[in-house]
Amino acid sequence: MTMKSIATYAALAIIGAAVDGLTSMAIPTGPAASHIQPVAFGVPLPQDPAPAADVPTAAELTSLLNKIVDPDVSFMHKSQLVEGGIGSAEAHIGDRELKNAAQKGELPLLFSVTNIRPGTSGSATADVSVSGPKLNPPVTQNITFINKGSWVLSRHSAMELLQAAGR
């Protein structure tokens, strides 16, 4: 045997002894070890949480609603915010209603979005409370949003909001 081989075997023996010593230190022995009792048998491990559903955040929906009711931006430039777009007649009526609301002191409107849930494929619903200077108590409606690459207000919900605003 060469000196190199002897040194290698000696190093392996030292490492093996060290590992054996660590292993024996990690396994409790004696009277304390026999007092450890399992408390549950056959209990399943917790499952991973279900993947998050494809729903927008409250901040995303609030931002969308704020853009829709911004009186300084024409409804012609809000077409991408509503499912199917906004026609020119609808845009004209929407602009007039928002300008009137601003002149009457009914703006700004504040939105509180809660209870966001996945809907049918590519949609989500949320409870939206609207408050403003002349909306006391706030009005709450369940609104549907559609995912078209970004979240937009469903056409049906847009019409309901316009009707509610006209009351």
From Swiss-Prot:
Residues 1-21 form the signal peptide. It is found in: Secreted. Keywords: Secreted, Signal. The keyword Signal applies. One of its GO terms (cellular component) is extracellular region. Belongs to the MTB12 family. This is Low molecular weight antigen MTB12 homolog. The lineage of its organism: Bacteria, Bacillati, Actinomycetota, Actinomycetes, Mycobacteriales. The gene is mtb12.
